[in-house]
A protein has these predicted regions:
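Short, conserved secondary-structure transition motifs
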Residues: 35-36, 191-192, 233-239, 246-249
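Short pre-active-site segment immediately N-terminal to the catalytic Zn-binding motif
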Residues: 192-207
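Post-HEXXH active-site segment of zinc metalloproteases
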Residues: 218-243
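Conserved small/polar residues in nucleotide/adenosyl-binding loops
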Residues: 323-328
Length: 328
């Protein structure tokens, strides 16, 4: 694939040059909030300076765990996830089986709705008898604080044959002028089985809040033209509303609103909340450096102004060396 990559990069550079840009990165970034490659690299390098020491400290902690085993082995890239999971269990002793009973799907969904009500004054009420494309789909009417309709929200939470996996937000009709939006969240949560309801993992809880953040972006928009409404925004802004909404999921005050044991109704204990919060920052130095290393490599590749003699192996080796990381 080395030659294919070189051709792709070459064609991208040629396209950028034809449109008056010195490199492909500046062409792509021209209509974003970042504006240009210099701003992006400044941000990435600044984040790197904070993330790398944290990742190194995490590596030291993992090495100590390996040393306890007495094998005399040095931590390698392929060891990271195995020993990270061992360390997680040792430090926090919190599993999905401890948290899932508190995360009944309907309670989590209603918790997300309650947060939206507190933040924006909106209400979501379930509608019955509305035609949908599948019996699993539920429909909610979204109203503003004054009772006026903002839009219709569909939820399609469960997997089925022929349905794609993953999670996303879609528009069936975008808001424009006085036309109200029809917005959908699609997910792949486990369906109820017998007397056991759909119980979510912590990751799935954050996914629900995240996708609902996208939905709110589409529902609360007020634009004259649908081409600028909702999620029709610059690429480096589109994830902001969803990321912000996702963070509400693990706020202690919010957790106590919706995280209740599906059998007893017990509110999630403070001890579990504390462990959830501690785990959110666990291994984040490594996770952040991995993301940054990939972004820096991509930026280095697409800020090149001459790729005629591009040697991908040499380029990648230099890029990895620059970030002081092993190739994971």
């Amino acid at each position: 694939n080395k030659e294919n990559i070189r051709k792709i990069v070459s064609l991208r550079l040629e396209k950028a040059n034809l449109l008056g840009f010195d490199c492909y990165a500046n062409f792509v970034l021209d209509e974003t909030m970042a504006k240009n490659a210099n701003n992006v690299m400044s941000l990435l390098n600044n984040l790197w300076s904070y993330a790398l020491p944290k990742a190194k400290a995490e590596a030291t902690e993992l090495q100590k765990l390996m040393d306890k085993e007495g094998k005399g082995e040095k931590l390698e890239a392929w060891d990271w996830w195995y020993y990270t999971e061992k360390l997680r269990k040792e430090k926090y002793n919190l599993s999905e089986e401890d948290t899932k009973p508190y995360f009944k799907l309907e309670n989590v969904r209603d918790g997300a709705f309650a947060v939206a009500n507190k933040l924006y004054g909106i209400t979501l009420s379930k509608l019955e008898g509305i035609p949908t494309y599948h019996p699993d789909v539920e429909v909610f009417e979204v109203k503003d604080a004054d009772g006026s309709q903002l839009g219709i929200f569909y939820v399609d939470y469960f997997p089925r044959p022929g349905k794609s996996g993953g999670a996303w937000m879609s528009n069936y009709r975008e808001q424009h002028g006085t036309t109200r939006p029809l917005v959908c969240n699609v997910c792949s949560f486990t369906k109820p089985v017998g007397d056991t309801p759909s119980l979510l993992t912590m990751d799935e809880v954050e996914t629900l809040f995240h996708e609902f953040g996208h939905a709110l972006h589409g529902l609360l928009t007020k634009c004259e033209y649908k081409g600028t409404s909702g999620t029709n925004v610059v690429r480096d802004f589109v994830e902001l509303p969803s990321q912000i909404n996702e963070h509400w999921a693990t706020e202690p005050e919010v957790l106590k609103m919706y995280a209740k044991h599906y059998q007893t109704g017990e509110v999630i204990p403070d001890e579990i909340i504390e462990k959830i919060l501690q785990q959110k920052t666990f291994n984040q130095g490594f996770m952040t450096t991995e993301l940054l290393a990939a972004a820096i490599l991509d930026m280095n590749l697409h800020t090149m102004t001459d790729v005629k003699n591009l040697d991908m192996l040499a380029f990648e080796k230099e890029a990895v060396s620059y970030t002081h990381l092993r190739a994971h």
